[in-house]
């Protein structure tokens, strides 16, 4: 299976079933047999196409009179991302993506992607170009001014650097700062109320705290437990709504609430 085929299958799960990108892509890569370079390419295609979805649709919709079915739409997005944002040569982006299309739509996909490749884009708005909803751009303009708002969104579209803790756990630097801000002492009891996937909980446990990690979804709580076990750390987990914590007052010395993000992909 090619990197593009793995990416397409993952994108269809994400877009069709509302699945989490990271939970879909990891197992898909493990099953794929791809080498490291192709794994990186598949990862870039999945996260990049998801991140730039609005912009990819704008690139495609100039040449589409009737909305395509969801599976074809996903394939067109994948091709448009390669052409518009991934720096893939046009012949490869078009040819390899068309090869993934069912015969009944292969000519359509080929025609649309060739036009995307050959036609300069005039973006209808900065928010379309940056692939954010209008309301996010407008709110940031109100708070920061237009130039700083655009700069902020451009920065958020950049792939973050990979940061690895001393114990080998891959965790964004900003998440590491959140855990460090708790300043726990050894033996203190800490509740990490919105814990999945477990990076902050395991960092607190590694610092000597007794940690209870909670998440509203049982599957997400199990993910915390799995990550803690992999690191050899004792973290108790509970599936619980942090707005109604099942603990009496005074149970913990500290409570960390790194509340769930907005889900905008930034």
Label the model's feature ranges.
Residues 1-266:
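S-adenosylmethionine
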């Amino acid at each position: 299976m090619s990197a593009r085929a793995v990416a397409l299958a993952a994108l269809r799960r994400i877009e069709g079933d509302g699945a989490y990108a990271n939970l879909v892509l990891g197992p898909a890569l493990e099953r794929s047999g791809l080498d490291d370079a192709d794994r990186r390419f598949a990862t870039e295609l999945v996260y990049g196409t998801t991140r730039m979805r609005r912009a990819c649709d704008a690139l495609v919709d100039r040449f589409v009179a009737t909305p395509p079915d969801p599976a074809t739409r996903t394939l067109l997005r994948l091709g448009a991302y390669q052409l518009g944002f991934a720096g893939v040569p046009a012949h490869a982006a078009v040819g390899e993506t068309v090869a993934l299309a069912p015969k009944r739509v292969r000519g359509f996909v080929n025609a649309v992607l060739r036009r995307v490749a050959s036609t300069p884009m005039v973006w209808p708005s900065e928010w379309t170009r940056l692939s954010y909803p209008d309301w996010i751009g407008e709110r940031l303009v109100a708070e920061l001014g237009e130039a700083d708002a655009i700069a902020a969104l451009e920065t958020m579209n950049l792939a973050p650097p990979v940061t690895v803790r001393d114990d080998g756990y891959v965790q964004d630097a900003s998440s590491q700062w959140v855990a460090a801000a708790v300043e726990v002492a050894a033996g203190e009891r800490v509740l990490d109320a919105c814990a999945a996937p477990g990076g902050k909980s395991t960092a607190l446990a590694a610092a000597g705290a007794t940690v209870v990690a909670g998440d509203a979804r049982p599957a997400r709580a199990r993910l915390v437990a799995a990550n803690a076990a992999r690191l050899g750390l004792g973290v108790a987990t509970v599936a619980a709504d942090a707005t109604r914590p099942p603990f009496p007052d005074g149970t913990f010395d500290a409570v960390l609430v790194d509340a769930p993000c907005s889900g905008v992909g930034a």
